[in-house]
Amino acid sequence: MPWKETCVMDLKMQFVVDWLSARYGVSDLARGYGISRKTAYKWIRRYQQEGAAGLRDRSRAPHHCSHAVPEDVVAKIVATKKAHPSFGPKKVLDLLRTLEPAQALPSDSTAGEILKAAGLVRKRSYKRPYPADPQPFELGVRNNALWSVDYKGQYQTSAGHWCYPLTVTDNASRYVLGCHGVSATDYAQARPMMEWVFHEYGLPEGILSDNGSPFASRSAGGLTRLSKWWVELGIRVHRTKPGTPTQNARHERMHGSLNRAIGRRMRGASSMEQQAALQAFCEEFNEQRSHEALARQTPASVYQASQRRYSPVLRPVQYNVDQAVRNVRHNGEIKWQGHLIYVSELLARHRVGLREVEGDLVEVRYGAHLLGHINLKTARLEPARQWHAGGEV
């Protein structure tokens, strides 16, 4: 009696026919049909009690469920998901707990099943996620110890122009400090936005960026007009290695959340509509979206503004007593031990600090920022490479 590929009901009926023939014992039938003796006796008993109808598959759902989720709670979970389409079940529950602390809520997995049953779980195409930063965020464990800044791609407006969302986040709390659409990735539009962030939240200890404009350049120390201004404000400048966005993974994950939440609304919208969408995303991300890395708290509940207040009046860059100070000439050169050494025209008419470090090398800094080392053998400045957390500073 081979186990034939047929429907389960037909198989059960054939089993009963063979049993009724009295040619086989129950053990032989169970072995032949590849079922246990317990199952064989169950089929026989149901046939004897109910006839052929007793052989149909029965629902495994319990007749009564003492922990069934009330309909009003299900409705709240579904409504919250619809209001925040990018939220998963955990974030939906965390938001409901904030809004209604006294409301009893189901487990994360049950909430997930509720959303799936409501057709609100969309299967995503797989993308390799940004892993945890391969270098530890030594500077990003306290509020305002390290901020990240970058542009979130580009979105075309209804007028055919491009919008480049400039974003700033605090690494420790994940709080989005600024998210503003600009029409160009240049100093002229980046500085006013950064000034607003500084006025609103104070100054960080350090800022992490990639190596693109207007954050970095190929000049000494990679300085630009924007990052030079940061140095003059007493902010440490950190950069990721070229082509290594994983070193700014927290910020990149926020960008992914932004695109999933409002990417469709951004495309082809007016400039005002795009900025309204960016502002709405910030409010949701900061005040309503919980983060597991924050013990399922929101960024707004964790973040506090910096005690270092911003002043538009810059103080002269200071140097230590063990540093020799030189003025940078209009052509970007300094004079050292009888040699004219090119540093950077960006620093023309500014002062730099020099200190002999070892052998024939002389360290050159603008404020706390390392520009490079003068090689006395070649009388040239060898540029520094400043990377994120742990690199030269």
Where is each model-derived feature located?
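Short, amphipathic alpha-helical "recognition" segments used to contact nucleic acids or chromatin
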Residues: C7-Y24, V74-A83
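Mobile-element integrase/transposase regions
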Residues: S109, E113-Y175, S183, Y187-E205, ...
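C-terminal, beta-rich DNA-binding module of retroviral/retroelements integrases
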Residues: C282, N286-V393
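Charged alpha-helix within mobile-element recombinases
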Residues: S219, R225-S311, G353, V357-E358
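Short, Lys/Arg-enriched anionic-surface-contact patches
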Residues: M1-Q14, H63-E71
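Basic, flexible linker segments flanking DNA-binding modules
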Residues: A52-L146, Q154, T224, T298-Y310
